[in-house]
């Protein structure tokens, strides 16, 4: 299993727990960006997990080090516009969080992966 990412978690406030949401932020953001949205969802029986992307250089941004799920090299149509290695590594990290939720007793069909921007791309990649 891949090493678990650092996460901000909001535990369910009622029992039984009915599911979990693993919600990834966008490029340059933090794990807590979408935490303020949770109360508006009215899902007290759900655990929310907000993983933090590792900090790494992003070529598109002049090599600036920032929270990033994967390197973006260019916006042009190119077979190497993103780092496939970074995407695979991140996918394994998210899959490890999914496995942890299953070990916590959450059925796989009650685990939702979501994300915004770069985090949304990773959510889609993992889901496929």
Language-model features: where?
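Serine-hydrolase catalytic machinery in alpha/beta-hydrolase-like enzymes
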Residues: 2-108
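Residue in the alpha/beta-hydrolase core beta-strand immediately N-terminal to the catalytic nucleophile
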Residues: 110-112
